[in-house]
Amino acid sequence: MRVLGIETTCDETAAAVVQLNPGGAGEILSNEVMSQIAEHAAYGGVVPEIAARAHIEVLDRLVARALEDAKIKLAELDGIAAAAGPGLVGGVIVGLTTAKALALASHKPFIAVNHLEAHALTARLTDGVDFPYLLLLVSGGHTQLVAVKGVGDYLRLGSTVDDAVGEAFDKVAKMLGLAYPGGPEVERMAAKGDPTRFDFPRPMQGRAKPDFSLSGLKTAVRVAAQRIHSPSQTDVADLCASFQAAIVDTMIDRSRAGLRLFRERVGDCNAMVVAGGVGANGAIRRALSRFCAESGLRLILPPPQLCTDNGAMIAWAGIERLSLGLVDDMTFAARPRWPLDSNAEAAHHGKA
């Protein structure tokens, strides 16, 4: 089985072809990604209209390249999948419309994929992990701990009550005068700084419910920065290091609470999976490795290029759904908000 996946929910335009081999293993045949960082850098963040226009300009070319790299023709595909949300509605419509047109033209099944579900299932493509497992989803727009029990079967254990982790990184970077995107810049500066200089709060620490709250931490960084007259590079590095240390401690504490709740509500946990762009942060990956080793839990960290948005994860989620006979019709609309919960109506779309 071979599926084309299209991703346009934010500021990456992506197309990929993934193959399901005999025995159930997935194989990435092509994975084309075009970032829009340069287009948005001057604004310090993603501008929805610019993002949508950029998707329109490059998507057809990326799809053609993905098919060429995979050495496959459109007619040889078994299905065409596209991220239908959550995300910026203009961009989602671009990818969704393109996928529907290709599916109609080639008489292939169309699969509407939840972008968050695609992140959740990536570890099954890279590592073949069995259900159930604990997902830590950390990106610019989402921070959640989710019990992944099956395709379309998710239990959200905890989430952020305000800022997502990636959003906090970007906002701290902006207030400290660092370049966009902020996550890699904060990590780069943190490597040079003293993580103990500033005693920033660890929000929600010790609470039984594994929710996150980062607005207070973000405010603490702003206050500390404002108290320093003309911060030097050393000051900025120390602020970044102290902020990142607080984030790491918070994520470990919240993950511990999430694992405890998983075992109470679901049972044995086969692994902890990290997904989303923030999962590429080296300090976070090292801390989670230690946490899982101490907890006797297998940790799955997909390659950094599969943590950020990509078409391969959409194609794989399409394969997972198509394997169960779940396809969608051409009336499926973009869903800028689309929760990843087992009791949400949107989690059970598709018809067998």
Swiss-Prot record:
It holds the Pfam family TsaD. The keyword Iron applies. GO terms for biological process: tRNA threonylcarbamoyladenosine modification. Substrate binds at residues 137-141, 170, 183, 281. GO terms for cellular component: cytoplasm. It is found in: Cytoplasm. Binds 1 Fe(2+) ion per subunit. Its cofactor is Fe(2+). Fe cation binds at residues 115, 119, 309. Its EC number is 2.3.1.234. SUPFAM superfamilies: Actin-like ATPase domain. Keywords: Acyltransferase, Cytoplasm, Iron, Metal-binding, Transferase, tRNA processing. Its main location: cytoplasm. It catalyses: L-threonylcarbamoyladenylate + adenosine(37) in tRNA = N(6)-L-threonylcarbamoyladenosine(37) in tRNA + AMP + H(+). GO terms for molecular function: iron ion binding; N(6)-L-threonylcarbamoyladenine synthase activity. It comes from the Bacteria. Required for the formation of a threonylcarbamoyl group on adenosine at position 37 (t(6)A37) in tRNAs that read codons beginning with adenine. Is involved in the transfer of the threonylcarbamoyl moiety of threonylcarbamoyl-AMP (TC-AMP) to the N6 group of A37, together with TsaE and TsaB. TsaD likely plays a direct catalytic role in this reaction. Belongs to the KAE1 / TsaD family. This is tRNA N6-adenosine threonylcarbamoyltransferase. It comes from Methylocella silvestris (strain DSM 15510 / CIP 108128 / LMG 27833 / NCIMB 13906 / BL2). The gene is tsaD.
